[in-house]
Swiss-Prot record:
It comes from Hydrogenovibrio crunogenus (strain DSM 25203 / XCL-2). GO terms for biological process: arginine biosynthetic process via ornithine; L-arginine biosynthetic process. It catalyses: 2-(N(omega)-L-arginino)succinate = fumarate + L-arginine. This is Argininosuccinate lyase. It is an enzyme of class 4 (lyase). GO terms for molecular function: argininosuccinate lyase activity. Pfam families: ASL_C2, Lyase_1. Keywords: Amino-acid biosynthesis, Arginine biosynthesis, Cytoplasm, Lyase. Its EC number is 4.3.2.1. PROSITE patterns: FUMARATE_LYASES. It comes from the Bacteria. Pathway: Amino-acid biosynthesis; L-arginine biosynthesis; L-arginine from L-ornithine and carbamoyl phosphate: step 3/3. GO terms for cellular component: cytosol. It is found in: Cytoplasm.
Length: 462
């Protein structure tokens, strides 16, 4: 970054001495808010068109401003822009460069506008753009989950509670659980976008402006759905950024839980899945290692988003109306949250459909831990026992199985009948893994038929 301390500071006339060099650096935000240059220029072009519409700028002045802003953007994208800490932020840097290019007309651009409503508009435009980039990637992840779920709709695996074997489920059913969670995350983000897409421009510093602005026209140019209806609120609140970060924290929480399973399942102890080599790394000392770095990093990065959410909440919690310099601290947490979501999302969307399932291992694991015990209890209920009595009978049978090393399906009929006389040879139909999953044939159940129907509904929605 070039520090042009010889450049006149655009807001310096009121002061009797120059700003301390360290204070200039300490209070500047250009180091990070320059990423919003497109949105700042987009907002300025719309503002200039509105100023022309209401008679504040003539036709030539409007042309000069738009041409100048296009040149500024071209210079930025070509790496020719000399960013100045002396000009503090993205807004003043662009205005100073514009004035350098087109002269005094550049100084008219800020008429009827403050940096307070300008930055609030920039952030909303930036976040709207990022949301619009994130949503298709979330759909890509959903498609990837559906591909894997469809491929493994009949693959049997153990379902867990407390990370202990509970009941058999299908791998496809398990994947569809993640699909449902991410579907709600998509809905949260779409809902968040509605509130992000509100235009504060025209609020000026805090009280509005005396100029005859037409906010509706500016909003139309910038494709905002709504206009903020209170100028104090428009410039001072960052609840929309908090809401996005809350979405991100929830979404990353889901990806972190998913990651935890992928890390466990890819271990030699589980051996349920294999992650393709391109999503893993090796060890510098142990030549046999294949480390699941992608899910581990996503799991780790979740914590930083939690931190950003708390940072933004804490930033806003004690601010009186309207704008305060504290709000400069909203951008780095928001920007890093956006980057973390996009990176984690891309990694998962690439990785999930490429996961290879070890069907023999998942089936063998489902046969352990008496996973069909509940099916035996349900069988006894259908024979007339109250569920609590059936629960007790099966508990005794499981205890016997632990002592003898036999699964329920491996016990002779006579052994099972010793626990209750109503048991007949039809019991073995319900004690198979296939029988167990197929019996749960209802909306939301793990039966392959229901899993395939759920996948079809999901595809239709997407």
């Amino acid at each position: 970054m070039s520090n042009q301390h010889n450049q006149e500071k655009l807001s310096s006339a009121r002061f009797s001495e120059a700003t301390d060099a360290f204070v200039e650096e300490f209070t500047a935000s250009i180091q990070f808010d320059k990423r919003m240059y497109r949105q700042d220029i987009q907002g300025s072009v719309a503002h200039a068109k509105m100023l022309h519409k209401v008679g504040i700028l003539d036709k030539q002045e409007l042309k000069d401003i738009i041409d100048g802003l296009e040149k500024v953007q071209s210079d930025i994208e070509a790496g020719k822009m000399n960013w100045s800490i002396k000009q503090e932020d993205i807004h003043m840097n662009i205005e100073a460069k514009l004035t350098e290019l087109i002269g005094i007309t550049g100084k008219k651009l800020h008429t009827g506008r403050s940096r307070n409503d300008q930055v609030a508009t920039d952030i909303r435009l930036y976040l709207r753009d990022e949301i619009d980039a994130i949503l298709p990637e979330m759909a890509r992840l959903q498609h990837g989950i559906l591909l894997l779920a469809e491929k493994e709709a009949e693959t049997i695996m153990p379902g867990f509670t407390h990370l202990q074997t509970a009941q058999p489920v299908t791998f496809g059913h398990h994947m569809m659980a993640w699909f449902e969670m991410i579907k709600r995350d998509v809905e949260r983000l779409e809902d968040c976008r509605k509130r992000v897409n509100t235009m504060p421009l025209g609020s000026a510093a805090l009280a509005g402006t005396t100029y005859p602005i037409q906010r509706e026209y500016t909003a139309e140019l910038l494709q905002f759905d709504r206009i903020s209806e209170n100028s104090l609120d428009g410039v001072s609140d960052r609840d929309f950024a908090i809401e996005f970060t809350a979405f991100a924290a929830t979404f990353l929480m889901h990806l972190s839980r998913f990651s935890e399973e992928l890390v466990l399942w890819s271990s030699a102890q589980f051996n349920f899945i294999d992650l393709p080599d391109r999503f893993c790394t090796g060890s510098s000392i142990m030549p046999q290692k294949k480390n699941p770095d992608v899910p581990e990093l996503v799991r780790g990065k979740t914590g930083r988003v939690y931190g950003h959410l708390m940072s933004l909440l804490t930033l806003m919690k004690s601010q009186p109306l309207a704008y305060n310099k504290d709000n400069q601290e909203d951008k780095e947490p928001l920007f890093d949250t956006v980057d973390t979501v996009k990176g984690s999302l891309r990694a998962f969307a690439d990785m999930v459909p490429a996961i290879i399932v070890n069907r023999e291992a998942t089936y063998a694991a489902a046969k352990q831990g008496f996973s069909t015990a509940t099916d035996l209890a349900d069988y006894l209920v259908n024979k007339g026992l109250p569920f609590r009595d059936a629960h007790e009978v099966v508990g005794l049978a499981v205890a016997h199985g632990i002592q003898t090393g036999q699964d329920l399906s491996e016990m002779p009929l006579e052994t099972l009948q010793a626990f209750h006389s109503s048991i007949t040879d039809d019991v073995f139909e319900v004690l198979t893994l296939e029988g167990s999953v197929s019996a749960r044939d209802h909306l939301g159940g793990t039966a392959p038929k229901q899993v395939k129907a759920a996948i079809k509904r999901a595809k239709d929605r997407l």
